[in-house]
Amino acid sequence: VLSDNDKTNVKATWSKVGDHASDYVAEALERMFFSFPTTKTYFPHFDLGHGSGQVKAHGKKVGEALTQAVGHLDDLPSALSALSDLHAHKLRVDPVNFKLLSHCLLVTLSSHQPTEFTPEVHASLDKFLSNVSTVLTSKYR
């Protein structure tokens, strides 16, 4: 559960991410594909090379979903219901991949926002991304 302080940290950090969300997520996806090659199996039709337009487009989709989630911190299940259905029933993504992408996104955010990325902010963002992952995998059961 996100505390009020966590919510403040997440909103403040995401507001600083701003228009860079899609770029940061695309970078995190590239990092994930490189660091965890098994994640590539869900994207057989993508060019996964550095700077790929397909990875950037997917980064934009994920960035928009995270921005929507930040706007609905008190009701993530409703805000992410359609995405949860998609990932559980159509795409059938292994739930561990959400954790891997979350980790790569934290690394990416810390590299772009080193001053703002305090231990407290790190913990808040980690909790937020964990909650998003939990919601996205909730319909797997």
Swiss-Prot record:
The modification N6-succinyllysine is found at K7, K11, K16, K40. Residues 1-141 form the Globin domain. The keyword Calcium does not apply. It comes from the Eukaryota. The modification Phosphotyrosine is found at Y24. One of its GO terms (molecular function) is oxygen binding. Keywords: Acetylation, Heme, Iron, Metal-binding, Oxygen transport, Phosphoprotein, Transport. The modification N6-acetyllysine is found at K16. GO terms for biological process: hydrogen peroxide catabolic process. Pfam families: Globin. Heme b binds at H87. The modification Phosphothreonine is found at T8, T108, T134, T137. The keyword ATP-binding does not apply. The modification Phosphoserine is found at S3, S35, S102, S124, S138. Red blood cells. O2 binds at H58. One of its GO terms (cellular component) is blood microparticle. Involved in oxygen transport from the lung to the various peripheral tissues. Belongs to the globin family. Heterotetramer of two alpha chains and two beta chains. This is Hemoglobin subunit alpha. It comes from Loxodonta africana. The lineage of its organism: Eukaryota, Metazoa, Chordata, Craniata, Vertebrata.
